[in-house]
A protein has these predicted regions:
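C-terminal non-catalytic regions of proteins with extracellular/luminal or membrane-system context
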Residues: 1-402
Length: 402
């Protein structure tokens, strides 16, 4: 579900500002009247003050009703469950999302005409993320599951591509849900099965099903926390302790509130110094397995953050690469149309995909850096900062935000 965002709260206050001002005027006038009659006879003063109090209550009632039936009407309907989005509006929104996705998918590589695949083709889709892809970001960019969601495999099926159901069941049986990455806390665990779980029979069945394989790699990131630059420290818990190490105090934000379950995939998902935007050990093993069994491999990177693609040079079997960020509620319909050739991919990269992210000049400059001499400006605990917040800064360098 959607997370609370301070900008959204401020927007609501802006929308109802005129109503609050009107009530404030009535309240001020009533208070002035109450003060002005203080020298009148007791009975008359009591009557006027009572009427002034009633006027305040009446004004408050009117203002609340005007707000609820005016600028807040749609929001209250949706929150209470009484509001609905009509079929026409929903259909238009779905069509727009599908068009945006279809036009935004980037064809980064296509050799030997591995893409597009004709409708009716069979495809082995590898990678746990194929059954749990990224649909959006975090905070206000999160997905609202109150409405139907089209997943990656459904998008392929609707485009006429038949996928290996044995592989899909293998992934959903392994883990049904994606670990949550949110604004307040982040579980960075990547549930990629250890390759020793792929049986010889499964791989033989896959090769008999199709000579083409797709591997899906996904990363989720967004508002509230930068992606970890040292996954090993997330695994051992020192990532959380960085607040104390860096600022000499436990007081900080939820910025480093990240965990990782390294036991899920039988351990050792990351080596020391590995960052979140590179292949994990399990993903490297998966690529080794797939490329040793298939000569026609399509890699799909599903994520909004530029991934480190230096590994592509090591796998000549990867002949196709598609970049597909979060697609929203139904955008994988558009993705399927790109794979099947119904839509010609026209997307272009908005970011630079470097072979080594750690060599970029901004690598050591982004973060959540705290002032150590601003105790008088610290804020108390809140929803956004459970441990309280300290004023922070960042040294801007070119490319840090793009």
């Amino acid at each position: 579900m959607l997370s609370i965002n301070l900008d959204d709260v401020m927007q609501v206050l802006t929308n109802v500002r005129s109503y609050l001002i009107a009530f404030g005027v009535v309240l001020a006038l009533a208070i002035i009247v109450m003060v002005a009659v203080r020298k009148l006879p007791k009975a008359k003063k009591k009557m006027i003050r009572a009427q002034s109090g009633l006027a305040i209550l009446l004004a408050l009632t009117i203002v609340i009703n005007l707000i609820c039936t005016g600028p807040m009407s749609t929001m209250l309907d949706l929150v209470s469950g009484s509001g609905t989005i009509n079929e026409e509006t929903s259909a238009k929104a779905t069509q727009l999302v599908n068009e945006i996705t279809a036009e935004g998918v980037v064809l980064a590589k296509d050799e030997d005409n591995v893409l597009p695949m004709a409708s009716g083709s069979k495809l082995n889709v590898f990678g746990w993320s194929s059954t749990n892809p990224c649909y959006g970001g975090t905070g206000s960019g999160a997905l609202n599951t109150a409405y139907p969601v089209t997943d990656l495999l459904t998008g392929l099926h609707d485009a006429g591509i038949e996928t290996n159901e044995e592989l899909s069941k293998f992934y959903t049986d392994y883990k049904a849900d994606r670990p949550s990455v949110g604004m307040v806390e982040q579980d960075w665990t990547l549930p990629e099965p250890n390759v020793n779980l792929y049986t010889d029979e499964m791989m033989e069945n896959a090769k008999a099903f199709s000579d083409t394989a797709m591997v899906v790699i996904t990363r989720v990131g967004g508002e509230g926390a930068d992606l970890p630059t040292d996954m090993a420290s997330v695994v051992d818990g020192s990532w959380i302790r960085r607040v104390a190490q860096a600022y000499g105090s436990e007081r900080g934000t939820a910025y480093y509130n990240g965990t990782y379950d390294d036991s899920l995939n039988e351990g050792n998902d990351w080596d020391k110094g590995d960052h979140f935007l590179q292949l994990s050990n399990r993903e490297e093993d998966l690529l080794d397995l797939v490329t040793s069994n298939f000569d026609n491999v399509i890699l799909v990177y599903n994520g909004a953050n530029a991934f480190q693609m230096d590994f592509l040079k090591d796998y000549p079997q990867i002949k196709g690469v598609l970049l597909c960020p979060g697609t929203g509620q139904s955008g994988f319909e558009g993705f399927g149309k790109v794979v099947s050739g119904e839509v010609n991919p026209s997307g272009r990269t908005a970011d630079t995909y470097v072979s080594d992210l750690t060599a970029a000049p901004w690598w050591n400059n982004f973060g959540d850096f705290k002032y150590t001499n601003t105790e008088d400006l610290n804020s108390d605990a809140s929803f956004f900062d459970p441990e309280g917040a300290t004023p922070s800064f960042v040294n801007y360098v070119e490319g840090i935000y793009v």
